[in-house]
């Protein structure tokens, strides 16, 4: 029965994901118009869909807890140390409690970061909120607000991670990593010699799979803090690096522009996506940016601890050094 349900779920997911490319053919056309466009693409309709992933993970988590205490614990209890038996209930509750707190706490603490003139520009108004966009912020169509010091919209929490809930997010992430890694390592060591009951094997596969995912994601977050950037800013830096590789990013008197070659010659545009004006730089001594060393990340303090403090401490001063001498 469980295998049939899994096969059905995988089939439906495949039909939905393939629908955009094969929408000219039935049944993909039905999945595209009825499911993909109305449920997935439209951010305002069927908002219950955003709770599907948290509900799925909550169900898996609850199933693992039931499997452990209902089927597995009796098999491995003798192999557990006494302190483990005392700590396990708290260790099981902590990730769930931290996750609920992170999901319920909005990222709404204002930030006063400086505009670097490359990724973020002053004078830009959010087209949805109709307010001035702070530097390092991002508008989330799912949450319906601009998020200060925005990192990403976490589908597992159905909440944006940003200034105001970084601490709870990191706490939930750390608690999950600790519990899942412990379980993935400890279950095989505590398994009865010479046999693996079906429940124990199922629990080990689930715990180990989620442990790998959780540890990988934690490592990416640690790397972002080290580099003084967010997931949102990392995506912007990828676009900047692509412009450098193509030789289209130029600078003049501390400002950055894109050089675009077309049928009418070369035109220059601001790196501000909201500024659609063309700039006359043909006779100006502009320089082509060819190395990331020419455009340092002004939001990176150079200290992992200070970068982390900017996220965790609502009173921390956001790094305000500006690019000079460009």
From Swiss-Prot:
A GO BP term here is: vacuole fusion, non-autophagic
Chief localisation class: endoplasmic reticulum
Q: Which catalytic reaction applies to this protein? A: L-cysteinyl-[protein] + hexadecanoyl-CoA = S-hexadecanoyl-L-cysteinyl-[protein] + CoA
Cytoplasmic side, ranges: 23-49, 107-164, 220-326
GO MF term list: protein-cysteine S-palmitoyltransferase activity
Which residue intervals define the domain DHHC in the entry? 124-174
Q: Please identify the protein, giving its name as recorded.
A: Palmitoyltransferase SWF1
Q: Which species is this UniProt entry from?
A: Eremothecium gossypii (strain ATCC 10895 / CBS 109.51 / FGSC 9923 / NRRL Y-1056) (Yeast)
Species lineage: Eukaryota, Fungi, Dikarya, Ascomycota, Saccharomycotina
């Amino acid at each position: 029965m469980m295998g049939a349900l899994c096969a059905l779920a995988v089939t439906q997911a495949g039909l939905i994901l393939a629908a955009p490319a094969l929408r000219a053919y039935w049944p993909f056309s039905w999945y595209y118009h009825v499911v993909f466009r109305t449920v997935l693409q439209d951010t305002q309709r069927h908002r219950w869909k955003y709770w599907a992933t948290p509900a799925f993970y909550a169900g898996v988590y609850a199933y693992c807890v039931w499997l452990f205490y209902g089927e597995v614990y009796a098999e491995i209890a003798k192999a557990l140390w006494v302190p483990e038996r005392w700590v396990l209930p708290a260790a099981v509750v902590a990730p769930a409690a931290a996750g609920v707190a992170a999901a319920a706490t909005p990222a709404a603490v204002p930030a006063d970061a400086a505009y670097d003139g490359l990724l973020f520009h002053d004078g830009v108004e959010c087209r949805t909120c109709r307010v001035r966009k702070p530097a390092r912020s991002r508008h989330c169509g799912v949450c319906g607000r601009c998020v200060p010091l925005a990192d990403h919209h976490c589908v597992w929490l159905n909440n944006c991670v940003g200034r105001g809930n970084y601490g709870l997010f990191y706490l939930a992430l750390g608690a999950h990593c600790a519990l899942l890694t412990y379980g993935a390592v400890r279950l095989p060591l505590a398994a009865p010699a010479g046999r693996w009951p079906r429940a124990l094997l199922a629990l080990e596969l689930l715990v180990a799979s989620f442990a790998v995912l959780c540890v990988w994601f934690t490592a990416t977050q640690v790397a972002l803090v080290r580099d003084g950037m967010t997931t949102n800013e990392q995506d912007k830096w990828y676009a900047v690096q692509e412009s450098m590789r193509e030789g289209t990013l130029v600078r003049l008197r501390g400002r950055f522009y894109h050089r675009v070659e077309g049928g009418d010659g070369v035109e220059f545009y601001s790196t501000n996506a909201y500024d659609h004006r063309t700039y006359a730089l043909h006779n100006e001594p502009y320089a082509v940016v060819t190395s990331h060393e020419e455009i340092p990340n002004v939001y990176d303090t150079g200290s992992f601890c200070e970068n982390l403090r900017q996220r965790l401490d609502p009173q921390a001063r956001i790094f305000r050094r500006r690019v000079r001498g460009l």
